[in-house]
């Protein structure tokens, strides 16, 4: 039971008239009137009792004279709903200070204006007007003061603004303001960051400034921007400190929900995490933004929304904010292999498309098509998969034709350009092109390595995936030749890595004895482009000490080391059943083999595989030349200098067992993808499939071994030591770990999972 605490003291109301109260009186006027116990939560620094906080009413101690207006406050609230503009006086504002914050329990009592949704992309929305809505309520004075004191000094802020190079535009405006308005009025420059909020303003507005400053710092580097070398603390330290404080006190504080600015703060947090490489944290923040937006009703395009605006100068469009939230969510879901948060597709209605710009229309169509790809990946049956894929492909073609052919030329980025606005929009166009080609890769990747009795059946998907990968990589080189700051345009690094891997695997798959290689003439130019991408990633790591760039460059370097040869040698992509993972995440492998540890997935083994005589015999009999094959096996962990092997007891034959009599006891695991246990094995010799997944019902093993999750590997071995099982789990990063602990963030897992999609999910 919480001990009662005195209601707001006389310090809170320095000019108020005090009255004498009986000894032991602690309750406020509102609790006394309601005959309720007045309790303060000791865990919360607040001048309001629990009851007043829940009701959203002023909490005034009985030692102060009660104003009759407070008693009738509830009735006045109801009347204000019907008023076109509520009447507010300075005394009213002071007494109603606690109402400036919407909490889930005070929705009914807050005097909102209910607003019809906009049918024009340029319309501004305003809610209940308040002369001092941006002023901090009394219960948040300490928080506002604390946040203000955490801001960098004005001298540091001025240096940060002067350090702007090609990042001289505040991109966070894209989250709230439509393109046509930004084209017409221009984007804000860093000088707007010099408008530092006063210590008495609402804490959400101070946090918004902190997050804007942090996201701007992401695009700067001390070695490239000399002005920030003399800051009172390192730019990265300032950036991290500002974000940590804003997240801890504002974006995760349910008491501060309800305003457009608070939603914008959560959106900026999600964008910040994505740029820093923390895709999983970005996804979590994005889902929080989606939930808040739904509570506000922003998803209800043809209905009513409810929210408030703290600062009348805030520019925003609620439907655009909803579009940005949903787009980022679907983009991250594709990268991470996660289900989408909502299936809303109203953003591509005829009305929305007609009111937007060319690039805005493309992005709206991309948002809807991402939803369809995610839906296909999640629910499509064997018969539907190919049909849905073809439909989405045609829609992407239609979306591309909505812009002129000249628009699709890769823009030439030049920091020397005097017009920074033009440079910004050229970069934005380049990114939109990359995202378009990434959708093509995501759409056709499951078919890229498949073969069929009809050899040309999947050629379209393979060639589309190859060409889209080239388009992504060429634009990535253009971007990173100019912008080598790791925290700028971060998601493009993940997309480029997937494109490079897809292109390399496509070339590997084409090097088969006796088969015509349709990519032979492009191999050297493609290889040179991937080498340039690898060099760019290496340089970014040298400049930024960036884990993602370092590991991506290392992986591509190893893949490039695999020689592409014809003859009787084929290239295999499988997962090593006995791979040994050291503490640094590398594996011990023979020459010519690349092994990648994928957390929660296994060890991917990529290398040349020379078939045995028996293998060649089976291959010739069943299907001709074997293409790439993929297996997935669990990871074994080495926590000390001695290797520890995981051996899985096989109760069904692996591809090696089928093709070679010299290894009759090759271990084989059971896997669980989408909660369906099956064995993934290379059976390239079988007709109509390069990857065959043999389903096995291992009920006994399922009872004895818990799955790590819906998409995680399950080891099928009753002798698997529980201590080693625990060690294996302990060595995985946390599910929402940052990029320093989990560089690839699970993007590699989603990539290989897409390639290894089972026949039950793919059309034949």
UniProtKB/Swiss-Prot annotation:
The keyword Transcription appears for this protein: yes
UniProt DNA-binding residue ranges: 28-59
One GO process term, biological-process aspect: DNA-templated transcription
Region of interest (Disordered), ranges: 73-94, 112-136, 633-672
PROSITE patterns, per database record: ZN2_CY6_FUNGAL_1
Keyword list, A-Z: DNA-binding, Metal-binding, Nucleus, Transcription, Transcription regulation, Zinc
Chief localisation class: nucleus
Location(s), subcellular: Nucleus
Function: Transcription factor involved in regulation of the dehydrocurvularin biosynthesis gene cluster.
Protein name: Dehydrocurvularin biosynthesis regulator
Organism: Alternaria cinerariae
């Amino acid at each position: 039971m919480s001990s009662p605490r005195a209601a707001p003291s006389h310090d809170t109301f320095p000019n108020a008239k005090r009255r004498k109260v009986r000894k032991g009186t602690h309750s406020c006027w509102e609790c006394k009137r309601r005959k309720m116990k007045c309790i303060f939560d000791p865990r919360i620094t607040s001048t309001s009792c629990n009851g007043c906080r829940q009701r959203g009413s002023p909490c005034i101690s009985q030692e102060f004279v009660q104003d009759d207006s407070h008693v009738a406050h509830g009735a006045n609230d109801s009347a204000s709903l019907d008023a076109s503009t509520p009447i507010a006086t300075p005394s009213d504002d002071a007494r109603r200070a606690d109402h400036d914050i919407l909490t889930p329990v005070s929705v009914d009592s807050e005097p909102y204006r209910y607003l019809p949704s906009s049918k024009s992309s340029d319309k501004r929305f305003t809610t209940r007007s308040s002369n001092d809505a941006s002023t901090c309520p009394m219960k948040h004075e300490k928080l506002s003061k604390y946040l203000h004191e955490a801001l960098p000094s004005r001298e540091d802020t001025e240096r940060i603004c002067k350090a702007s190079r090609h990042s001289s535009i505040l991109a966070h405006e894209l989250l709230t303001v439509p393109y046509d308005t930004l084209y017409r009025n221009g984007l804000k420059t860093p000088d707007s960051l010099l408008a530092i909020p006063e210590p008495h303003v609402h804490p959400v507005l101070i946090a918004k400034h902190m997050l804007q400053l942090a996201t701007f710092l992401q695009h700067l580097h001390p070695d490239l921007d000399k002005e920030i070398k003399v800051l009172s603390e390192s730019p990265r330290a300032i950036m991290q400190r500002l974000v940590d404080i804003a997240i801890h006190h504002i974006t995760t504080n349910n008491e501060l929900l309800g305003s457009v600015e608070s939603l914008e703060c959560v959106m900026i947090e999600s964008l910040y995490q994505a740029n820093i490489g923390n895709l999983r944290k970005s996804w979590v923040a994005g889902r929080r933004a989606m939930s808040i937006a739904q509570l506000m009703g922003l998803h209800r395009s043809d209905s009513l929304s409810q929210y408030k605006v703290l600062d009348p100068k805030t520019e925003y469009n609620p439907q655009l904010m909803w579009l940005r939230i949903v787009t980022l969510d679907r983009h991250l879901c594709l990268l991470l292999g996660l289900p989408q948060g909502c299936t809303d597709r109203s953003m591509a209605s005829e009305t929305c498309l007609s009111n937007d710009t060319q690039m805005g229309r493309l992005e709206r169509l991309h948002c809807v098509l991402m939803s369809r790809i995610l839906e296909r990946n999640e629910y499509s049956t064997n018969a539907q998969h190919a049909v849905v894929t073809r439909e989405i492909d045609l829609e992407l073609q239609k979306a591309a034709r909505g812009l002129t052919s000249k628009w699709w030329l890769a823009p030439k980025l030049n920091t020397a350009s005097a017009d920074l606005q033009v440079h910004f929009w050229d970069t934005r166009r380049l990114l939109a092109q990359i995202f378009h080609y990434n959708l093509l890769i995501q759409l056709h990747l499951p078919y890229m390595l498949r073969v069929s009795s009809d050899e040309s059946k999947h050629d379209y998907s393979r060639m589309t995936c190859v060409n889209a990968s080239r388009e992504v990589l060429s634009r990535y080189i253009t971007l990173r030749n100019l912008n080598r700051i790791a925290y700028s345009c971060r998601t493009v690094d993940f997309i480029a890595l997937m494109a490079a891997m897809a292109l390399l695997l496509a070339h590997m798959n084409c090097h088969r004895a006796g088969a015509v290689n349709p990519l032979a003439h492009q191999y050297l130019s493609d290889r040179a482009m991937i080498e340039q991408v690898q060099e760019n990633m290496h340089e970014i790591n040298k400049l930024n000490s960036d884990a993602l760039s370092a590991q991506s460059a290392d992986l591509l370097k190893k893949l490039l080391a695999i020689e592409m040869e014809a003859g009787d040698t084929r290239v295999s992509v499988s997962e090593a059943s006995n791979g040994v993972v050291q503490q640094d995440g590398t594996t011990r492998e023979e020459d010519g083999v690349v092994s990648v540890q994928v957390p929660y997935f296994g060890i991917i083994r990529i290398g040349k595989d020379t078939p045995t005589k028996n293998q060649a015999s089976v291959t010739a009999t069943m299907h001709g030349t074997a293409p790439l094959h993929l297996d997935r096996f669990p990871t074994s962990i080495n926590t000390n200098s001695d290797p520890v092997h995981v051996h899985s007891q096989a109760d069904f034959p692996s591809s090696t067992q089928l093709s070679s009599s010299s290894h009759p006891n090759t271990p084989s695991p059971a896997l669980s993808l989408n909660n369906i246990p099956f064995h993934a094995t290379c059976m390239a010799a079988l007709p109509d499939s390069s990857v065959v997944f043999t389903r096995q019902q291992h009920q006994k093993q399922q009872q004895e071994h818990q799955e790590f999750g819906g998409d995680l590997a399950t080891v099928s071995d009753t002798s698997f030591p529980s201590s080693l099982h625990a060690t294996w789990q302990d060595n995985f990063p946390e599910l929402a770990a940052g990029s320093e602990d989990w560089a690839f963030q699970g993007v590699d897992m989603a990539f290989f999972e897409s390639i290894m999609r089972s026949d039950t999910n793919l059309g034949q």
